[in-house]
């Protein structure tokens, strides 16, 4: 099957750069599956896993939102943070989840609930993706 290059990039640099047969992402508008020769598209992404298939192998990368840019010859995912499943520190992700849950339970006026909710979503996503490796 044909392949195409995929780059997942954060402000700290590239996280994933490989040739794949298919990319699956959760865009704000729903699931997207991208194959070689896909029409050009730009879409915002949800906090989720990016699935990258090549042959019988699938790689998983946790992204904290961002954008996907699809060109006929290349796909680029831009995200503020991204981690491959096998690089996720499970202890750190569990700690982040615990802290976010604690902040959401605090009844103090200074707690930014939306920010705590986003932190919780990111931590849960990282834990879910780490289980996919």
Curated annotation (Swiss-Prot):
The keyword DNA repair does not apply. GO terms for molecular function: ATP binding; proton-transporting ATP synthase activity, rotational mechanism. It is a peripheral membrane protein. It comes from the Bacteria. Keywords: ATP synthesis, Cell membrane, CF(1), Hydrogen ion transport, Ion transport, Membrane, Transport. It is found in: Cell membrane. InterPro entries: ATP_F1_dsu/esu_C_sf, ATP_synth_F1_dsu/esu, ATP_synth_F1_dsu/esu_N, ATP_synth_F1_esu_C, ATPsynth_dsu/esu_N. GO terms for cellular component: plasma membrane; proton-transporting ATP synthase complex. PANTHER family: ATP SYNTHASE DELTA/EPSILON CHAIN, ATP SYNTHASE EPSILON CHAIN, CHLOROPLASTIC. Belongs to the ATPase epsilon chain family. HAMAP family: ATP_synth_epsil_bac. This is ATP synthase epsilon chain. It comes from Bacillus mycoides (strain KBAB4) (Bacillus weihenstephanensis). The gene is atpC.
């Amino acid at each position: 099957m044909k392949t195409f290059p995929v780059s997942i990039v954060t402000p700290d640099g590239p996280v994933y750069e490989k040739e794949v047969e298919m990319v699956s992402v959760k865009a704000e508008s729903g699931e997207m599956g991208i194959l070689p020769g896909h029409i050009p598209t730009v879409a915002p992404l949800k906090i989720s896993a990016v699935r990258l298939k090549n042959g019988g192998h699938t790689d998983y990368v946790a992204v904290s939102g961002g954008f996907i840019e699809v060109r006929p010859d290349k796909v680029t995912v831009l995200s503020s943070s991204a981690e491959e499943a096998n690089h996720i520190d499970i202890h750190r992700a569990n700690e982040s989840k615990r802290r976010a849950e604690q902040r959401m339970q605090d009844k103090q006026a200074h707690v930014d609930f939306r920010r705590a909710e986003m932190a919780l979503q990111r931590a849960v996503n990282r834990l879910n993706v780490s289980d996919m490796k």
